[in-house]
């Protein structure tokens, strides 16, 4: 469909019977109205032509061959001659055969039928809207029981119950036995209600605004109730409040989309165009048919049987009518979702028939395989690996993938810079991988984001935009913090990369889809970019240290003098140091690490600013050293305080590691960058 802004879109939902009839109804030039499928036949076994008013009728769906009617007459399509537009003998229009791909039909159901997707699928929309148990509604739909209509001050048959000396055990089975078909219909229309018609009456009588107001009022009353301390009652109230919220949202959705709840009960059943459920002739003259055709035939057979019972057989018991209505309901259920009520319907080879649900849903369904799973231009695919040097909004593209994705842009750049005179020469330079090619590719990629997608795309974070960076190898590099949104890890997962071409797509990628702009879950608001797996292990290794602090040296056998807190440690590089080093700034400490004088977990003393207190109020120093000039040194578990007689505290040294310093610097720079960006 096309909306008021001329955007092509697809909407799936309930439609009215009038809309279904409008889709399928067709008025021929002679004034005859066609569109209703009344016969369960497909092709005649002798002529191999579609049966009239059958599932492949040419009057309803159009001719099999363009411009040729069922009689074999030919008329040119689109000619301006005064030839008739349809054949008066067979009633087939002279139109293009492609009409059979979208011209629908319909089956007029003798009794209302509940749509099984709205009844049996969880959550059950019908049960939520009517606020009734699903088991009770199922029994009503499949004629297992019925309820009495409210007829005030009128004598009714059901009021005789209780006047007898004994009670009839099961009225739902005994009542129809006393009536003929015509009498039972009169009785049922007057006093009882059962089947999908009863559901339709209740849905038609429901006022969505009243449902919303009453549900909201009940929700507030439950919230105002004081807790009784009973865990079971609190759980029951919480479950009821959740149900009321779902009911309010469902009612608002019906109001917002202008959908009547009674449309969930079908009176007209749409019939798919013939080309979407074909019958194909294979070698040997055998026919292969879509499973949908057999399910449609089953519905038409049972519907016609019910029509005959109501129209001709006046002596048929009412119980037989109810049983036939149940069979029609089950046939339509099988058409929509085979096996939803138990054992699925099978063919002669014990193969399960594929219903609408099987055709649509799943990885091999119509949407994911045919519509969403298509290969597109300007896209690639590769395994993902971790990129520890990437920023959050960057991804690493292998040169082989990048040159293919941006080849058209590189060719344009080569021609504009007069490096190549035409497209052929430009492609040859790309094949030879000349240095100028990579320079132009770098320029193109700087201003062009790419989209990364990991299947299955279950929510909007499954596809995000990144700034591409050229990397070596054949794997896509990804920042580990964005893995949670994709539900990805680095154990062999593959991701697809797409290039947005239009200016609108590039603007959407930059403004809405960049990874650093999708840090919170759109569903619950929790952070998505949180460290997991590899990052947690890396942070642990980076900040590992002895929790005992300086006390770890006290009982070290390699220390001959505990007072100097010496610690001898041998590393793989075969160098030793016997004293913990002192550094005046974090820059000096990281410089020593880069010069390989210390390791990430090497303990060291770092001078700390006096305005940032690290002293515990009740902590007792391990040792206090005094000097001859009055200076003193208080040694604690994780820090030292150096003071003098004139100045209480001259400086503070904290005991840390190069890994802790590096981690702190990264956090500090990130916070400062955040404040600069938003100040």
From Swiss-Prot:
Highest taxon of source: Eukaryota
Catalytic activity reported: RNA(n) + a ribonucleoside 5'-triphosphate = RNA(n+1) + diphosphate
Keywords, in A-Z order: Chloroplast, DNA-directed RNA polymerase, Magnesium, Metal-binding, Nucleotidyltransferase, Plastid, Transcription, Transferase, Zinc
Cofactor(s) needed for function: Mg(2+); Zn(2+)
Similarity annotation: Belongs to the RNA polymerase beta' chain family. RpoC1 subfamily.
Role: DNA-dependent RNA polymerase catalyzes the transcription of DNA into RNA using the four ribonucleoside triphosphates as substrates.
Quaternary structure note: In plastids the minimal PEP RNA polymerase catalytic core is composed of four subunits: alpha, beta, beta', and beta''. When a (nuclear-encoded) sigma factor is associated with the core the holoenzyme is formed, which can initiate transcription.
Protein name, entry field: DNA-directed RNA polymerase subunit beta'
Organism encoding this protein: Phalaenopsis aphrodite subsp. formosana
Recorded name of the encoding gene: rpoC1
């Amino acid at each position: 469909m096309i909306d008021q802004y001329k955007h092509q879109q697809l909407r799936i939902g309930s439609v009215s019977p009038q809309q279904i009839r409008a889709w399928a109804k067709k008025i021929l030039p002679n004034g005859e109205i066609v569109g209703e499928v009344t016969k369960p036949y497909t092709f005649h076994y002798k002529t191999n032509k579609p049966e009239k008013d059958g599932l492949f009728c040419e009057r309803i769906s159009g001719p099999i061959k363009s411009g040729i009617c069922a009689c074999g007459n030919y008329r040119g399509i689109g000619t301006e001659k005064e030839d008739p537009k349809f054949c008066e003998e067979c009633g087939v229009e002279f139109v293009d055969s492609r009409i059979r791909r979208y011209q629908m039909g319909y089956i007029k159901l003798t009794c209302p039928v509940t749509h099984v997707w709205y009844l049996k699928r969880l959550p059950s929309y019908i049960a939520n809207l009517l606020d009734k148990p699903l088991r009770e509604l199922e029994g009503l739909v499949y004629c297992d029981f019925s309820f009495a209509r409210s007829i005030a001050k009128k004598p009714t048959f059901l009021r005789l119950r209780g006047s007898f000396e004994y009670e009839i055990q099961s009225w739902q089975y005994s009542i129809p036995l006393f009536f003929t078909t015509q009498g039972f219909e009169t009785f049922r229309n007057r006093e009882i209600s059962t089947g999908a018609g009863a559901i339709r009456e209740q849905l038609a009588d429901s006022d969505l605004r009243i449902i919303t107001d009453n549900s909201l009022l009940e929700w507030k009353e439950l919230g105002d109730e004081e807790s009784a301390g009973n865990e079971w009652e609190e759980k029951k109230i919480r479950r009821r409040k959740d149900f009321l919220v779902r009911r309010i949202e469902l009612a608002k959705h019906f109001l917002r989309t202008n959908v009547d709840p009674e449309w969930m009960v079908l009176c007209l059943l749409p019939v798919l165009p013939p080309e979407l459920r074909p019958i194909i002739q294979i070698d040997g003259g055998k026919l292969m048919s879509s499973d949908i055709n057999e399910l449609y035939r089953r519905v038409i057979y049972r519907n016609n049987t019910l029509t005959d019972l109501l129209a001709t057989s006046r002596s048929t018991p009412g119980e037989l009518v109810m049983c036939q209505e149940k069979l029609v309901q089950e046939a339509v259920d099988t058409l929509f979702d085979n096996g939803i009520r138990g054992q699925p319907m099978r063919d002669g080879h014990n193969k399960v028939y594929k219903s609408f649900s099987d055709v649509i849903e799943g990885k091999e369904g119509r949407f994911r395989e045919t519509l969403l799973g298509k290969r597109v231009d300007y896209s690639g695919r590769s395994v993902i690996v971790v990129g520890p040097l990437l920023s959050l909004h960057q991804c690493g593209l292998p040169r082989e993938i990048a040159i293919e994705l941006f080849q058209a842009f590189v060719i344009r750049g080569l021609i504009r810079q007069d490096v190549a005179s035409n497209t052929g020469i430009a492609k040859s330079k790309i094949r030879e991988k000349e240095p100028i090619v990579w320079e132009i590719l770098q320029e193109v990629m700087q201003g062009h984001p790419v989209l990364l997608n990991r299947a299955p795309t279950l929510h909007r974070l499954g596809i995000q935009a990144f700034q591409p960076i050229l990397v070596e190898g054949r794997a896509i590099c990804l920042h580990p913090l964005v893995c949670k949104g994709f539900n990805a890890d680095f154990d062999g997962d593959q991701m697809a990369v797409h290039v947005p071409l239009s200016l609108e797509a590039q603007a959407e990628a930059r403004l809405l889809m960049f990874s650093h702009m999708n840090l919170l879950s759109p569903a619950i608001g929790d952070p998505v970019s949180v460290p997991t797996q590899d990052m947690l292990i890396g942070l642990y290794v980076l900040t590992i240290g002895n929790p005992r602090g300086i006390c770890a040296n006290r009982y070290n056998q390699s220390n001959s003098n505990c007072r100097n807190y010496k610690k001898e440690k041998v590393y793989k590089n075969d160098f030793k140091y016997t004293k913990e080093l002192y550094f005046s700034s974090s820059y000096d400490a990281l410089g020593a690490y880069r010069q390989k004088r210390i390791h990430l977990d090497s303990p060291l003393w770092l001078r700390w600013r006096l305005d940032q207190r690290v002293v515990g109020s009740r902590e007792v120093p391990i040792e206090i050293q005094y000097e001859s000039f009055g200076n003193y040194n208080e040694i604690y578990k994780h820090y030292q305080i150096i003071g003098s007689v004139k100045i209480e505290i001259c400086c503070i040294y904290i005991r840390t590691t190069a890994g802790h310093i590096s981690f702190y610097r990264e956090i500090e720079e990130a916070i400062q960058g955040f404040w600069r960006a938003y100040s």
